[in-house]
A protein has these predicted regions:
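Short glycine/proline-enriched coil/turn segments at helix->beta-strand junctions
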Residues: 24-29, 64, 87-89, 111-112
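Conserved strand-to-helix beginnings and helix N-cap segments that scaffold or border functional pockets
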Residues: 78, 103, 128-130, 169-173, ...
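C-terminal substrate-binding/catalytic lobe of Rossmann-fold NAD(P)-dependent oxidoreductases
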Residues: 2-59, 141-255
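Thr-Gly-centered strand-to-loop micro-motif
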Residues: 68, 93, 118, 193-195, ...
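Rossmann-fold NAD(P)-binding glycine/threonine-rich loop
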Residues: 75, 82, 95-118, 123-126, ...
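Rossmann-fold NAD(P) dinucleotide-binding segment
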Residues: 58-94, 103-105
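Proline-centered loop/turn at the N-terminus of a beta-strand
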Residues: 8, 90-92, 114-116
Length: 255
């Protein structure tokens, strides 16, 4: 079912895999693609205006409550940064693979506008982190302090995606690793293994190894619709102060 948003959504990367999922599940005012795309200038499903080839073509003055969703690639970050900075437009950064310089600029931008940093727009991943990983990591930390001198203890993440995915490891895997490391006081190295196949949408497994036994928890995306549906949480940006937010923040607010 299409979400009739009370905000004017601007979608960069409207014709990609993630962009298609967002379009399928949300009403989008302006969609942006590459200037070379043969669909530029044409009307496509769930897009209120013809597809544009640049953010410079967006009629920003016509929009009352614009929110920009980036579902493209890091190569577009500078133009997205400039657009959001100059127009004070809230940003949903759903693209992945950004370098340290870009992440630092994102942090600076968050002093001016609210930003939802969502390498994965799935509500399930947000639930997985907050309700499953978080308590598990807390208990792991306590256990680690007792047994680390007696047995080899380690954590590993395995991420599996389709072979058209550009970045490796996935942004979600990196986010999961950082999420865990930020909650463990002892120095721990978390290895990430990337697997590519013909059809996987996105599977992430976190393995806690205790020498002769291990505990595995995982999240598996079965449909791309979950990303488009998760993008609906962007409406909560309208009422937020400048800062960087996560899907977990908005998942709690939705409930």
């Amino acid at each position: 079912m299409i979400n009739r948003s009370s905000s004017d959504l601007i979608l960069v990367g409207a014709t990609g895999r993630l962009g298609n999922s967002i379009l399928k599940n949300n009403e989008v005012t302006f969609g942006i693609s590459s200037k070379k795309n043969i669909l530029v200038g044409k009307k496509i499903d769930h897009l209120l205006n013809p597809l544009l080839g640049s953010l410079k073509d967006v009629s920003i003055k016509e929009l009352k409550t614009p929110i920009l969703i980036d579902a493209s690639f890091p190569e577009n970050f500078e133009s997205i940064y400039d657009f959001c900075f100059h127009n004070k437009v809230p940003l949903v950064l759903a693209s992945t693979g950004h370098n340290d310089t870009q992440i630092n600029k994102l942090k600076e931008l968050s002093k001016i506008i609210p930003i939802l940093h969502a390498p994965n727009l799935s509500r399930g991943i947000a639930f997985f982190k907050a309700k499953i990983l978080n308590p598990l990591v807390d208990d792991f930390e306590k256990y680690l302090s007792k047994v680390s001198s007696k047995i080899d203890v380690s954590i590993k993440i395995i991420e599996t995606h389709h072979n058209k995915k550009k970045d490796s490891p996935s942004g979600t895997a990196i986010e999961l690793r950082n999420y865990i490391l930020n909650r463990i006081s002892q120095e721990t190295d978390i290895q990430i293994k990337s697997v590519r196949d013909d059809s996987s949408i996105g599977k992430h497994e976190v393995i806690f190894n205790f020498g002769k036994e291990e505990i595995l928890v995982s999240h598996n995306a079965l449909s791309r619709d979950i990303f488009g549906e998760g993008a609906r949480l962007s409406i909560f940006l309208k009422s937020k102060n400048p800062s960087i937010y996560s899907m977990e923040d908005f998942l709690e607010e939705e409930n």
